[in-house]
Amino acid sequence: MHTLKNIINKTFDNKLNIHQHNVDQKTTDAINQVLHMLNIGKLRVSEKINGFWITHQWLKKAILLSFLVNKNVLFSNKQTCFYDKIKLKYCNYTEEKFKNEKIRIVPPATVRHGAFIGKNTILMPCYVNTGAYIDEGTMIDTWATVGSCAQIGKNVHLSGGVGIGGVLEPLQNNPTIIEDNCFIGARSEIVEGVIIESNSVISMGVFIGQSTKIYDRNNKKILYGKVPSGSVVVPGSLPSKNNCNLYCVVIVKQVNAQTLSKTGINKLLREITE
């Protein structure tokens, strides 16, 4: 692994001089090996270590380099053709392999090579970009998008039209992270490396980036970039210095995992005025 990391870092430092026609086979093999290991979940761009999310920047670099060194290739799903530098994850899957991994995929769901999909996952017609990691028991609903290198935990529900931001375009330092047992409401957007901690419920139409004010109603505090564990979050607004109300999101209550498991999502959101 140390050798792979050194090759990637050294090549990335020289990226302005690298292209398809001058890259050596050893470098190409190293880059493609990293993508394969991301694809099967042996590596992940970001992981929680001792309670903190750590981003492995060299893995992001490998993904970016793959666009420099790999050529566009023609591939087909029997309905139409594609022409891209990264193939689709399930191009060569057999029925047996799908059964073993207990994954259900509804057309035209699209997953690029380099993304990991855990067991017991359901993919409605959605899009999952390379480098993403989706853990077990998660559902990605219709027209939801999981951006490059985004990290999605166990038993997460991404509702219809949800957008989870990537890190490659525009380039971001850290991936967007949705921890275990979270519910993200329809048409919400979580981007720019924001972390939604475990057991949180995000209402429909919530937009959170690094500059979005996250107002904790009970504690009267403003947070940025992270929604604490067990939060129930809805759209809102706060008055500015010029008496103009500006968009924010509001943490209206905190719930623990036990309450979340026993209480319907709709009930939690309908009781926000209590």
Swiss-Prot record:
GO terms for biological process: diaminopimelate biosynthetic process; lysine biosynthetic process via diaminopimelate. Its EC number is 2.3.1.117. Keywords: Acyltransferase, Amino-acid biosynthesis, Cytoplasm, Diaminopimelate biosynthesis, Lysine biosynthesis, Repeat, Transferase. Pathway: Amino-acid biosynthesis; L-lysine biosynthesis via DAP pathway; LL-2,6-diaminopimelate from (S)-tetrahydrodipicolinate (succinylase route): step 1/3. Coiled coil: none annotated. It is found in: Cytoplasm. It holds the Pfam family THDPS_N_2. It is an enzyme of class 2 (transferase). One of its GO terms (cellular component) is cytoplasm. One of its GO terms (molecular function) is 2,3,4,5-tetrahydropyridine-2,6-dicarboxylate N-succinyltransferase activity. The keyword Acyltransferase applies. PROSITE patterns: HEXAPEP_TRANSFERASES (PS00101). Substrate binds at residues 104, 141. It catalyses: (S)-2,3,4,5-tetrahydrodipicolinate + succinyl-CoA + H2O = (S)-2-succinylamino-6-oxoheptanedioate + CoA. Its main location: cytoplasm. HAMAP family: DapD. Homotrimer. Belongs to the transferase hexapeptide repeat family. NCBIfam families: dapD (TIGR00965), PRK11830.1 (NF008808). This is 2,3,4,5-tetrahydropyridine-2,6-dicarboxylate N-succinyltransferase. It comes from Buchnera aphidicola subsp. Baizongia pistaciae (strain Bp). The lineage of its organism: Bacteria, Pseudomonadati, Pseudomonadota, Gammaproteobacteria, Enterobacterales.
